[in-house]
Amino acid sequence: HVGMIYTRRASEAAPGDVTLQDRHTVGADFDFYTSQFLGQYNAQFEGFVLYHTDPVTGGDLSASERSSRGVRWSFPNDLIRVHSSHREFGEEWNPAVGFVERRGFRRHQPTLTIAPRPQNWQYIRQTEHEIFFEYLTDLDDRLLTRNIDITPLQLNFESGDRASFEVGRNFERLDSAFTIYGRGDDAIRIQPGVYESDKWSVSANTAGRRMLSGGVSYESSEFWGGDRDSVDLSGTIRSRNGMSLTANYQHNEVSLPQGDFDTNLLRLSWAWNLSPFTAITGNVQYDDLSNVVGVYARLRWIIQPGNDVFL
């Protein structure tokens, strides 16, 4: 498919402020997919480009500073799955409608997964072996982030259960300090610099088709010049068709040269599918770092396929 988007946001400057123009954003994307690549394989090619006008009358921002673009190709097949993506966001990319978490960067991200199906292993349906690589720079090609994650082995059982082991290495360039824990004079701050870290993790998950299912994972890693141990637990109950309740708990123990601290996160989520056309979902979340409880709920009503109402 090929898609397009256009948004306009009117602006009214306050007395004495720089005159603001109405903000216009235009963009296009495409997604081409085939199941007949080389006669028998799946393949996909995607891309997008977006541009917005200068918010200030007579502004001097270049078109490249006010645009973003990206492409992605993938080969999503059973034995071999490979994809690679590239995206770039201008230094002044700031559409009036919508937002991004980061701007002024280039990101390359290839992944290779090999997933054979052993013929002589009675309880093993498939094994997976994956290499994930991320390389992120600023627009002057200065390295900001580099991640290498390797999954030497993931076991997918005939029962639907899974178990995996993963190792990884991270590079992070921090240009400004930030507070990671606490407030005031007792705050623990991470200072600018270059940080490299290693990690390893193990995880196990039971099949989601069961009335009771869950998962557990443990990760040990270097963390901003110190160490972190993390435990993640989850459990789901499906008391009847169309209803589910999931609880997640995460505990982190962090040890840094500046000080030690622990964090806890608890989340409860639910889904109730009243019919094929109506569903209620939501979650409640609390963490002892912010001491804030967040609540989210949504009702979705499908009037007809392609026409949905959300509340």
Where are these regions (language model features)?
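A conserved hydrophobic secondary-structure block that centers on an alpha-helix together
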Residues: 1-21
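Accessory structured domains or lobes within enzymes
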Residues: 22-24, 282
